[in-house]
């Protein structure tokens, strides 16, 4: 038996994010579905006030986890152009697609051909025209530079060592002046022997050395262990 929705309201801080309240008192975040009637990863669809919303699961999306954990700055709005490195099968990009809308654009880079096919099936083939899929290796931005114009945000979520370096290298190519970077640090992908806090410091220092001001850092527990989200901007 499904739990009835009693209210949907805009999130107090984040554009394009909504808070859904259920009759049992629980609340979940959601985005307004750009392609009504279609799911991407089995998420709950919620109808309210003539609109359809997609529940945004923090156990499936690190950006959702950061928002639920109190992230204050999400530099994504309607019309934002973004480079997303490590698009995987499209869970988080799909919600960003909802937020940026038809005027926005998400260049989505994924390395694995198998996962890339899933991304195509779940997002592009279902009519999300603001998503540009790119099969490529985020370590080598010159390989896909001809596909991408300047972007407002570079976001990275890859299971690679040197995550901050990869992010900064891509930002050097594509980030507009005044733009933001969003770094998901996966500590265990960098050094399984070091404490996660030390790995976080190491990656943050890399961004600082590349000229970035760190605006915010949020840890993602309990949704993801040994993960953190960092928001930064070029000085």
UniProtKB/Swiss-Prot annotation:
Its EC number is 2.1.1.-. PROSITE patterns: FIBRILLARIN (PS00566). GO terms for biological process: box C/D sno(s)RNA 3'-end processing; tRNA processing. It comes from Pyrobaculum arsenaticum (strain DSM 13514 / JCM 11321 / PZ6). Interacts with nop5. Component of box C/D small ribonucleoprotein (sRNP) particles that contain rpl7ae, FlpA and nop5, plus a guide RNA. Keywords: Methyltransferase, RNA-binding, rRNA processing, Transferase, tRNA processing. One of its GO terms (molecular function) is histone H2AQ104 methyltransferase activity. Coiled coil: none annotated. Involved in pre-rRNA and tRNA processing. Utilizes the methyl donor S-adenosyl-L-methionine to catalyze the site-specific 2'-hydroxyl methylation of ribose moieties in rRNA and tRNA. Site specificity is provided by a guide RNA that base pairs with the substrate. Methylation occurs at a characteristic distance from the sequence involved in base pairing with the guide RNA. Belongs to the methyltransferase superfamily. Fibrillarin family. This is Fibrillarin-like rRNA/tRNA 2'-O-methyltransferase. S-adenosyl-L-methionine binds at residues 91-92, 110-111, 137-138, 157-160. It is an enzyme of class 2 (transferase).
């Amino acid at each position: 038996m499904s739990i009835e929705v009693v209210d949907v309201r805009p999130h107090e801080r984040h554009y394009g994010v909504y808070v859904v309240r259920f009759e049992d008192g629980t609340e979940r975040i959601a985005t307004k579905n750009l392609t009504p009637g279609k799911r991407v990863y089995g998420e709950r669809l919620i109808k309210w006030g003539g609109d359809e919303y997609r529940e945004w699961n923090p156990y499936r999306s690190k950006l959702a986890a950061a928002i639920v954990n109190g992230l204050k700055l999400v530099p994504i709005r309607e019309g934002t152009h973004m480079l997303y490195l490590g698009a995987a099968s499209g869970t988080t990009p799909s919600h960003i697609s909802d937020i940026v809308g038809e005027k926005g654009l998400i260049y989505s880079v994924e390395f694995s051909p198998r996962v890339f096919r899933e991304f195509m099936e779940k997002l592009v083939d279902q009519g999300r025209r603001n998503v540009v899929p790119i099969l490529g290796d985020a370590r080598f931005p010159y390989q896909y530079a001809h596909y991408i114009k300047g972007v407002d945000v570079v976001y990275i979520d890859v299971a690679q060592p040197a995550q901050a370096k990869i992010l900064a290298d891509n930002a050097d190519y594509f980030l507009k002046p005044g733009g933001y970077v969003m770094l998901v640090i996966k500590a265990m992908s960098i050094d399984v022997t070091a404490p996660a806090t030390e790995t976080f410091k190491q990656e943050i220092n890399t961004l600082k050395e590349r000229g970035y001001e760190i605006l915010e850092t949020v840890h993602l527990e309990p949704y993801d262990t040994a993960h953190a989200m960092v928001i930064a901007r070029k000085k």
